[in-house]
């Protein structure tokens, strides 16, 4: 393995250990506590417009809460989820324990996964919800997700913005509090997505919500 590959693998292992340690107990109350400030998730999922019988992957699927919501809106979709935390996937599998449809959940690195790991050639939709702000090498996660799309597929992202339209004191307090949970909103998210869309001849839709509390984006890949 190259030096870069070794360093990346080491960083992934370290991040996995960090996430498992943080979520070993938090996962039991995660959905209850996060619903008050992880805004825009449900509307993003409703707008996924997954084709009938299409494939949907969530990168950083956590407890499976978003997957369950997506299943209610797109009952024929084939669901897949990856997370670097084994602890979170324990909760994800419990979320679907009594349901007829069970997604394929895998422990995987968001920066280095391929559709083949899930037995498919690509995904029609990929969702990254409040995960890029927790992935150290988040640009590579965007790269991997775009590469995993089917022709004409869509990558949907919702995450913390820069609160640019809100009072400075609110932004300062929020970002200091988020840092305690290893969350870092990405100030250059739009620029990175614009560059990626241009490179892949894809269309980018980007919007700010709630004074920049939430940034939401969709990259629509080129049809072959």
Residue ranges and their predicted role:
Residues 2-49, 65-69, 170-176:
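Conserved class I S-adenosyl-L-methionine
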Residues 10, 33, 156-215:
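C-terminal alpha-helical "lid/dimerization" subdomain adjacent to the S-adenosyl-L-methionine
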Residues 53, 149-154:
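Short glycine-dipeptide loop
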Residues 57, 63-113:
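Class I SAM-dependent methyltransferase SAM/SAH-binding core
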Residues 115-126:
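A short acidic, Gly/Pro-enriched loop at the edge of an enzyme's catalytic core
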Residues 124-137:
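A short SAM/SAH-binding and catalytic strip from SAM-dependent methyltransferases
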Residues 139-151:
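A short glycine-rich, Lys/Arg-flanked "PGG" loop and its adjoining helix->strand segment in the class I
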Residues 217-224:
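C-terminal lobe and adjacent flexible extensions of AdoMet/dcAdoMet transferase-like proteins
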């Amino acid at each position: 393995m190259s030096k870069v590959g070794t360093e990346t693998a080491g960083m992934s292992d370290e991040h996995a250990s960090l996430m498992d340690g943080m979520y070993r107990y938090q996962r039991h109350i995660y959905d209850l506590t996060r619903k008050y400030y992880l805004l825009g998730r449900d509307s993003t999922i409703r707008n996924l417009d997954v084709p009938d019988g299409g494939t949907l992957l969530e990168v950083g699927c956590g407890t499976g809460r978003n997957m369950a919501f997506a299943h209610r809106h797109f009952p024929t979709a084939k669901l897949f989820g990856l997370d670097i935390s084994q602890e979170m996937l324990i909760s994800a599998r419990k979320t679907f324990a009594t349901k007829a449809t069970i997604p394929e959940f895998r422990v995987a690195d968001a920066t280095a996964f391929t559709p083949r790991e899930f037995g498919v050639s690509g995904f029609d939709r990929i969702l990254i919800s409040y995960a890029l702000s927790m992935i150290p090498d988040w640009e590579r996660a965007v790269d991997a997700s775009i590469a995993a799309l089917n022709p004409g597929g869509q990558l949907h992202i919702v995450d913390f913005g820069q609160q640019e339209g809100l009072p400075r004191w609110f932004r300062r307090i929020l970002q200091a509090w988020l840092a305690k949970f290893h969350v870092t909103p990405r100030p250059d998210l739009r620029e990175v997505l614009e560059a990626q869309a241009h490179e892949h001849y894809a269309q980018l839709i980007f919007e700010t919500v709630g004074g920049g509390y939430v940034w939401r984006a969709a990259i629509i890949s080129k049809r072959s």
